[in-house]
Amino acid sequence: MAPWPELENAQPNPGKFIEGASGPQSSIPAKDKEASKTNDNGTPVAKTELLPSYSALVLIEEHPEGTDPWDLPELQDTGIKWSERDTKGKTLCIFQGVGKFILLLGFLYLFVCSLDVLSSAFQLVGGKVAGQFFSNNSIMSNPVAGLVIGVLVTVMVQSSSTSSSIIVSMVASSLLTVRAAIPIIMGANIGTSITNTIVALMQAGDRNEFRRAFAGATVHDFFNWLSVFVLLPLEAATHYLEILTNLVLETFKFQNGEDAPDILKVITDPFTKLIIQLDKKVIQQIAMGDSAAQNKSLIKIWCKSITNVTEMNVTVPSTDNCTSPSYCWTDGIQTWTIQNVTQKENIAKCQHIFVNFSLPDLAVGIILLTVSLVVLCGCLIMIVKLLGSVLRGQVATVIKKTLNTDFPFPFAWLTGYLAILVGAGMTFIVQSSSVFTSAMTPLIGIGVISIERAYPLTLGSNIGTTTTAILAALASPGNTLRSSLQIALCHFFFNISGILLWYPIPFTRLPIRLAKGLGNISAKYRWFAVFYLIFFFFVTPLTVFGLSLAGWPVLVGVGVPIILLLLLVLCLRMLQFRCPRILPLKLRDWNFLPLWMHSLKPWDNVISLATTCFQRRCCCCCRVCCRVCCMVCGCKCCRCSKCCRDQGEEEEEKEQDIPVKASGAFDNAAMSKECQDEGKGQVEVLSMKALSNTTVF
């Protein structure tokens, strides 16, 4: 043991202490500073002086580490305890609890109904365009194009069930093969995860809540994307899903059965049908190539109609077209016969708001889209507020322990699989994975459910929605039973394969880590969440679809270099993180690139500038030009004019001008509490200088 243990880690590097420390600081503990601020000689001690080398404060004092933002918050009960209430207070508390529970159910009901109306609004806005995507059979044979078509169509109609029913109809009519339909099913699985991502945006008010909520929503996205990246090439090379589902259909003799029970629809349909009703057969007719369906409206007008079959005299080209010789005659000019003519007679109109309006589908869709988003946002805010007021103290502790605690050893590994079964069962009950994951998102945001527990619940919801599709396929007519059942089984085994890839082994649970990383970025730069939503669900699929229209050579020529570049960046990032010593000094960080290529800070400055364009005296053009120059330059010496800088940036520059030195061999690096408080900004500047932003854009 060293004779001076407090000097074991001393580094004889002169000039490390902060300039202005003119002498040794007192060894009096920081908590006694207020009582005595003199050293051993009785002279006043400067606030920036260092402790003497013989002080053991550095060995005793424990510096509190930063709290993990992913830790579930402690929901403390700040109200009056139950034991301290009188009879009147207890009665009032009971009525308040019952009232909050009723309000919670009411807002949850409106939340689910707004999701249904939102789906109808998306179908009115983009349903016909989605049907036209399916009508181009030459593009559908391309697996990559089929994948992005599935994403775009499901995003537009906000329902994987609708897109799946269109695919089943096309396969049953021999317009599409099962092999070509499998990539579309994979794309539909990705597109359905946009709903809970939109819901997570509503919690952007609080950074920590938004961090958890957005990560909990995007864990579904990353699971679907990663599964597609692995299984789509595998399916294109081996066709294992097609072969496996064929084997299942040949082994088991399936017969027509009853449809899946509509438990949630029974509750929500009476309300949503008063707002809007759609004729979803129009989208299927457009996808089947019926040109007459282009002029039809998706808004359902007549709900009751009867079919009359009457005998009528009709003209035919010749006697060969007559129904029978006895029912055929001619008047010298035309040939007549008697035929049964079927006429559809409308009896009663539907009872919804837009039944008597002559507005086009696009206008009605925009109105419903705006209203449903407002209601969705309001309901979500109220649900979060009510849950935050109810889930306090012992109630929150019990719920969090129930949801997030594992089974005792050695059965802890079974907890996640039980959560998968729970997620599948709940999704089967509500008949929609979007509803289940969207309802779970605010619970993740307020800290009731952890990301690690939300992940298996989300995987279970993927399984639950496919079991619903299988039951719906069993209720299909005889001519479409096999095709619809095979499509549903392909969807089922695709999700099972994804779970086998990304869940059983803990280190393969990449969606959790990726979602947490995206949650951290989105919490710091909240505009990035909107960018992620637009880029990955609209821009990328539309770009790939446009390249697919140009043919395979163009798609490969543009796509392969981009994929190789992304793989190169990923490999370099892994080497920087795991074993940077094997890399050249220049490649150990991203500072060799311009700042705008490896950091979101310049982009954040541009967006902040765009949102506060007219709040300062400096003209907008001057500020934009100055900021763009600094962004492109990436040099630390580059400075904008004073009028273009924020006040915070000017203060930060003043802090960065403080010279820094290292302590000598016999200088204690520990500072008193008072000195730490005074120099907190300086230490933060030092740490910011030491760390480089490795966020690759």
Curated annotation (Swiss-Prot):
Residues 1-91, 158-213, 385-408, 508-526, 573-696 are cytoplasmic. GO terms for molecular function: phosphate ion binding; sodium ion binding; sodium:phosphate symporter activity. Residues 1-45 are annotated as: Disordered. Highly abundant in the ileum of small intestine, whereas it is almost absent in the duodenum and in the jejunum. Residues 113-136, 235-363, 430-486, 548-551 are extracellular. Optimum pH is 6.0. It is a multi-pass membrane protein. This is Sodium-dependent phosphate transport protein 2B.
